[in-house]
């Protein structure tokens, strides 16, 4: 997920085009094979509006999307996000927006039912014999932790640690 501060366009290039180029270069670098293998697997589909959305979004676009349009699975994934930036202030700004948008709407019983449906879909696709995806496996632990973060994170921010074991404790 690539985000940037809301900023003005320049006569030479729009902010969205500038940051699109920047995000494309970083993504290519991360995917480029090296003698030691791929540096990092970066799934760029995890962004507002998926593959059809902009590769890099402004804070305000991200905020609006999460508040108004994000699917339950996207909100679950966002409970584990960790910003990477050279600027501590940018990270603080991101967390303020992230917290406000993620908890702008309650986690409803319908959302909980959707989590259960997602879990069963994964089990059907991966099979119950898989240690990670089978009953009681890592997928169950992750779904429980992420669901609890969305349900109780606003009132108890200490559970918002992106590391599952720390959040559960």
What kind of region is each of these model predictions?
Residues 1-169:
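A nucleotide- and high-energy phosphate-metabolite-utilizing enzyme signature
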């Amino acid at each position: 997920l690539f985000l940037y501060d809301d900023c003005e366009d320049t006569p030479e290039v729009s902010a969205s085009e500038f940051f699109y180029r920047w995000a494309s270069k970083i993504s290519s670098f991360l995917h480029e094979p090296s003698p030691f293998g791929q540096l990092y697997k970066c799934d760029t589909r995890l962004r507002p509006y998926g593959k059809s959305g902009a590769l890099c979004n402004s804070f305000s676009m991200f905020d609006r999307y999460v508040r108004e349009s994000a699917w339950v699975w996207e909100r679950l994934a966002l409970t584990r996000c960790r910003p990477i930036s050279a600027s501590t202030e940018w990270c603080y700004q991101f967390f303020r927006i992230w917290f406000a948008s993620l908890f702008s709407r309650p986690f409803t019983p319908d959302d909980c039912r959707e989590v259960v449906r997602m879990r069963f879909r994964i089990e059907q696709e991966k099979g119950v014999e898989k240690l990670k995806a089978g009953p009681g496996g890592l997928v169950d632990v992750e779904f429980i932790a992420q669901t609890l973060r969305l349900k109780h994170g606003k009132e108890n921010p200490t559970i918002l640690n992106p590391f599952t074991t720390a959040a559960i404790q």
